[in-house]
Amino acid sequence: QGQNIFDVKPDASAEPGYAEQTNGERMKVQPGNNAPMWRQVGQGVTGYSSLPKTQAPEAGNLIQPFVQYPGSRVTNAGEAWRQVRNQWIIPYGAALFAIVLLALGIFYFTKGPLGHDHPEGPGTRRIERFTPFERAAHWANAFAFIALAISGIVMAFGKFFLLPIMGSTLFGWLTYALKNVHNFVGPLFAVSLLVIILTFVKDNIANRADFVWLSKGGGMLGGDHQVPSHRFNAGEKGLFWWGVTIPGIFVVGSGLVLDKLIPGFGDVRSDMQIAHMIHDTLAIWMM
C-alpha cells in the first residue's frame, strides 16, 4: 500500500529495524525511498532478470561485489580493477620502459655498437647456425610481437604522449585501427610462439656449461670474453624461458580470454578484469 508523503511521520527513520527494511517495507513508511534496493545494488546483490544465466550470467548484477585485487583497496571489482590499472600497471610500466631505454642508451654510448667481424677469403668456413625454417619462424614471431607491442603501447599509454599532439579525433581513429591490428595479429603471434617453443626447446635445457657461463658473468668476469657454451648460452636460455616462453603462454592465454575464445572463461566481468591485469603486466615484462 502506498502512502501520501505528507502523511508520513517525520521520525520514520527512528523506527526499530529501519535500516534492515526491504524496499517494500520502506515504501510503507517513506514512499519513493528506494534506498534498500540501491544499497543492495551497490553491494553486488544479484537481482531478478528474465534473461537466462547461460546467455547473460551477470544480468542481475549492475555493480560487482566487493573484492581486493593486488594493489587495490577493498571495493567493488570494477573500481578495484581501475585502481590496479591506473595506479600500478600504467605508472610502473611506464617507469620500467624508461629505465630500460636509459640502460640501453648508457650501454650503447659506453660500449658502442657490438658487431662481429666476418672474415672472407680462401679457407673461410661458414657454419649454418639457424636453418631457413628457424629464421622464418623467428621473423614471423618478431613481426607479430612488434605489431602487438606498438598497438599495445598506444592503447595503454597513447593518451599521455599522442593525444595532446594528435587531438581526440585522430587519436580515436588511430586507437580503433590499432585495436583491430592487435586482435588480428594476436593469433599469428600465438601460432608462431608455439612453433618457436617446439623448435628451440631442446636446445634450451640447462646443463653444466651454463653454470660455468654464469660464474664468469658471460665473459664479463675473469677476462675470458668467449666463454664456451652449447648452441645457446645461459643468458639466452634465461631469455627463452623467462622472457619468451612462460610469459608468452600467459599473455596468449589471457588474450584469448579477453577475446572470449576459451569456453567457460570471459563470460563475466571478473574473468576479463583478471585476464586484463595478467595480459598487461606480462606484456610489459616481455617488451
What are these regions (language model features)?
Residues Q1-M287:
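Membrane-embedded alpha-helical bundles that constitute the cytochrome b-like, heme-associated redox core
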